[in-house]
Amino acid sequence: MNMVSLPETINSPILYFLDVGILLGGLGVVFFGKIIYSALFLGVVFVCVALLYLLLNADFLAAAQILIYVGAINVLIVFAIMLINKPETKINKKKITFGDILSGFSVFGLFSFLIIMILNTTWLQPTLVSQEVKNSFQSIDIIGIHLLTDLLLPFELLSILLLVALVGAITIARKEISPKI
């Protein structure tokens, strides 16, 4: 398989463009009021991540990203939104509760911890990956071995996170039953 190696002068602007696309897509997911627009911006994020994989010459991961996330999960989200047809609800202004304050401090603490960890990490110089390293990760078998040996803990944590997101989505999508008096 021939690998495409782009020069650094071309690779860096494409990388920055994709990073901005991921950032703006993520902001679109969070800040758009209509949920269908949020789902479409989520698709933009998934496509940009797949293009990042292509930029890193990880063809298998890029194809898996497109097939699984864009082709299956994002389409499933859009279908669920269209089938539920839940009317938009107005946000009621309420007083700040103790849970809101506790959540705010938890999020602030988590982001502070992440920033400290990022600043204390020794990063490699941003150079292109050598041909030996590229060839070592081409095999699907090697990807599976790395996922189930070296990366087992992050792999399992990600599966738990996806399970929690699925339970949360089901809870949100479930129709509210009002008692009849």
Curated annotation (Swiss-Prot):
An annotated Gene Ontology molecular function: quinone binding
Keyword annotations from UniProtKB, A to Z: Chloroplast, Membrane, NAD, NADP, Plastid, Plastoquinone, Quinone, Thylakoid, Translocase, Transmembrane, Transmembrane helix, Transport
Reactions this protein catalyses: a plastoquinone + NADH + (n+1) H(+)(in) = a plastoquinol + NAD(+) + n H(+)(out); a plastoquinone + NADPH + (n+1) H(+)(in) = a plastoquinol + NADP(+) + n H(+)(out)
EC number: 7.1.1.-
Topology versus the membrane: Multi-pass membrane protein
Recorded GO CC terms: chloroplast thylakoid membrane
A Pfam family of this chain: Oxidored_q3
Transmembrane segments annotated in the record for this chain: 13-33, 35-55, 64-84, 98-118, 152-172
Stated family: Belongs to the complex I subunit 6 family.
Function: NDH shuttles electrons from NAD(P)H:plastoquinone, via FMN and iron-sulfur (Fe-S) centers, to quinones in the photosynthetic chain and possibly in a chloroplast respiratory chain. The immediate electron acceptor for the enzyme in this species is believed to be plastoquinone. Couples the redox reaction to proton translocation, and thus conserves the redox energy in a proton gradient.
UniProt name for this protein: NAD(P)H-quinone oxidoreductase subunit 6, chloroplastic
Organism name: Staurastrum punctulatum
